[in-house]
């Protein structure tokens, strides 16, 4: 803090006068007055040389400085003398004042020199020791800096105790133990818990709102806590002082409930994590309900996810049978239940109703609406129609009739779509993307997409590189057929078991083929068209699973490579492709019962490298290219056409978001999924799904490796 110039002058003048009168050792004389006169005139108006020095002490001891005199209020007084010299001065001053007071006119003789000198030296030593102690103590804690500026001097200090907060809380804890300075008494049940409002408010938003607002409790010395476990409250009060909690299975729920009331976020998190670690099929429903009641979103979500994942084990426990109807409905309406089929969920509902038929019979109609009855086997629906539990309930009869129509009128299913016709995610299987061309000239990896986790995972690798091959699924196993490795066209076949992740070599085809189409129809697998390295093929081979051999069937009317092949309504369709001169827009189908191929209505555009799939009785053709064989500058297509076999007609639906050649298409659940492809510059890893009801495409989670010409199939594992 600086002072005005006037004050600086006054201070200097006072110091100068003091030094002029009292700075030298006392000169012994029998005449005190002459002593005063000598001291008074000897230095008046003359500078005092070498007497005003600034002293500072560092951590290692006393250090002299030649810096100018400081005038800050917190700084040392300008030009102080050493401690022993100040002692002598003070004694001299005191002695002189005494003489003045005793007799101003006739000075008395002064005490003997030796006695006076000894007293001065002793006093100086004492003061110097005290000064050294004070300086040592100060320099251990303070760092004082002196500026070089004569006009503006500033002293700054910073002091920090690392464990100050911890020491303070320990002191507060001791006050709590001794019941000292407590200013509030919390009453819960049989317990009376003393505490400090400041500590409680610092830890709990609940108490902060209570004690800092104009409410009745803010002025009360005793606060009654309703609806909270006394022991849990006491534990949380102790936690406010110590930060320590004991978590036990038998008290964790009461502790979490109290923490939710007091809005102790950290305690809520640790208690929730403790319960999450205890999740089991026998208790997950109880923890789920508790998390919902307490508003613990994280605990509720984790417990619900665990219940969905382990549903088959959960329904075997008592907690499931004791659930109220509204909780059962929350479970049944979820798409994420991990079950192999809808029939499993139906039997779980009937088990719950059977546990207390008299009281739960009336809830059956409401709960049955959450079961996807159209997806149940028709034999089961026929049995339910005559069951006494269903015949007397009009709502149940209505739902059963809807499901039976879905089975009896398959051609009308597209008009019967509802939430009950949408399969649950776990019942539709998983999507497998196999091989394809990538930036490294061909990938051998297999990726799996799970609807419930919404993610792609690497689950296997082919034994060798294949491009332009085909894949079909028989008995939940993937058959990889033909293709080419570089310029070598293959006729080899391999079988991949997703459960054991084992590859098995199968009998080869009779003809080497790449660019072929592969599909299953009524059991057997067909290899259609392609290129053998020399010419475009119209021949077709059929794999007999029982005989384990390949046989030729009727040939197509037109050679086709990069052809799309799919089965629909007991017929095998071959769509588009290339015949050596140009891309094709024609389509023909094979009837296995007559062993003949027949032409259908053509597409609106010539296309090869298309992706084909069926959904809800329609055939979809996606993407591709339309360049002739001699032109390498293909025009890539984003066009999507839909074929109606009943009317033998084509219609155009919403296009892809980007053009895709050599694209893979496959139905999964209630949507069509388009995977990868080539856009003219990049091997794509993007994925789109098509919603037929809304006629729109939606971007989905991408595959890990961009690929074109991959084969995508669905496998339903038990």
Swiss-Prot record:
One term of GO molecular function: ubiquitin-like ligase-substrate adaptor activity
Pfam family of the protein (one): BTB
UniProt subcellular location: Cytoplasm, Cytoskeleton
Domain (BTB): residue spans on this chain: 182-249
Tissue/organ expression: Expressed in adult fibroblasts and in a range of fetal tissues including tongue, palate, and mandible.
Disordered: annotated span: 46-69
SUPFAM superfamilies named among the record's database cross-references: Kelch motif (SSF117281), POZ domain (SSF54695)
A single GO BP: proteasome-mediated ubiquitin-dependent protein catabolic process
Ranges occupied by Kelch repeats: 430-476, 477-523, 525-570, 571-617, 619-670, 671-717
Keyword flag DNA-binding: no
Highest taxon listed in the record's lineage: Eukaryota
Keyword vocabulary terms for this entry: Actin-binding, Cytoplasm, Cytoskeleton, Kelch repeat, Repeat
Ranges in a coiled coil: none
Entry GO CC: centriolar satellite; ciliary basal body; cilium; Cul3-RING ubiquitin ligase complex; cytoplasm; microtubule cytoskeleton
Protein name listed in UniProt: Kelch-like protein 4
Originating organism: Homo sapiens
